[in-house]
Amino acid sequence: MEKVKGAMTALITPFRNGKLDEEAYARLIQRQIDNAIDAVVPVGTTGESATLSHAEHKRCIEIAVEVCKGTSTKVMAGAGSNATHEAIDLAQFAQKAGADAILSVSPYYNKPTQEGLYQHYKALAESVDIPVLLYNVPGRTGVDIKPETVCRLFDDVNNIYGIKEATGSIERCVELLAKRPELYVISGDDAINYPIIANGGMGVISVTANLLPDKISMLVHAGLAGQFDTAKMINDELFDINKALFCESNPIPIKAAMYIAGLIDTLEYRLPLLEPSKEHMQLIEKTLAKYEVV
C-alpha cells in the first residue's frame, strides 16, 4: 500500500454559470502537476463538496484522475458524509475511477460518539482496498476524533494510515505521533505547516497551494528532507497570505484570490457561500500584490 504524503493541494471547484467548469478544473490541476505537487485532493472542504451533487462530486474525481494519469502526482479523493452508506459509495467510486487514496472527513452535524466514529471509519475503509486518511476538523463538523479513536483505527484497520489534523493544535499532533510513531500526521492548517512537519508530520493538505503551489512544494520537500531552516523561512514568508486566505470561511477567500490572480475566469460560489465582503476583498487584493501574484 503506497501511503500518499508530501505537498498536497485541497483543490477549489470552479463554476461557470452555476455548473462545474471542467476545463478550468483540469487547467488548475495541471498547474499543480507542473509545480511539483505530490497529490491533489478534489472535493474536500475547499472544493465546496457540501454543495455538489453526487454526480458533480464523482465527475471532479474523474477529471483529477484523468489529468494526473501518467504523472507522479497522486489523487486523494474526498469521500466524506454524515451517512456512512454515502461515504462508502463515494469511496468505492473513487477507487474504481483510479484514485490513489481516500480523504474522509468525520461525519458532521449528527455528532456521533467515539464508538460511532470508529464503526463509521472501519466500515468505510474495509469497503475499499486503497489507503484511507482520516480528516479531523471539529470546528466544522462538531465532533472531534479523539486520539484514542485514531490509534484504535490505525491499529485495527490495515488501510487507515494517518490523519489530516485541522484542529490547529500542534499539541494534538505531537500526542498522536508520541502514541503511534508510524501514523502519518498531515497538516490541515497552512499557518502551522512547518511546525507539524518539524515534529514528525508527513506532509500537508494545503489551501494556499491552490495559489502558490511552488512555495508549498518547496516548504514541504525541504521539511521532509530535514532542511528545517529553509522550511521555516518559507512558512514565515507565507504568514500574511495564509492569514488573508482565512479572513472568511474557507473556501471563500482562496476562490476570490484565484479569480483576482487570473487563475479562474469566473468568481462563483453556491449558496449559502457568497463573495467576500468589500473590506475582505480589498485585503486579499492588497496581500496578493505584496506576493506579486497579480
UniProtKB/Swiss-Prot annotation:
Chief location bin: cytoplasm
GO CC annotation terms, alphabetical: cytosol
Binding site for pyruvate: 46, 205
Pathway: Amino-acid biosynthesis; L-lysine biosynthesis via DAP pathway; (S)-tetrahydrodipicolinate from L-aspartate: step 3/4
Gene Ontology BP terms: diaminopimelate biosynthetic process; lysine biosynthetic process via diaminopimelate
Coiled coil: none
Xref: Gene3D superfamilies: Aldolase class I (3.20.20.70)
GO molecular function: 4-hydroxy-tetrahydrodipicolinate synthase activity
Keyword annotations of the record: Amino-acid biosynthesis, Cytoplasm, Diaminopimelate biosynthesis, Lyase, Lysine biosynthesis, Schiff base
Record's function text: Catalyzes the condensation of (S)-aspartate-beta-semialdehyde [(S)-ASA] and pyruvate to 4-hydroxy-tetrahydrodipicolinate (HTPA).
UniProt protein name: 4-hydroxy-tetrahydrodipicolinate synthase
The organism of origin for this protein: Nitratiruptor sp. (strain SB155-2)
Lineage: Bacteria, Pseudomonadati, Campylobacterota, Epsilonproteobacteria, Nautiliales
Name of encoding gene: dapA
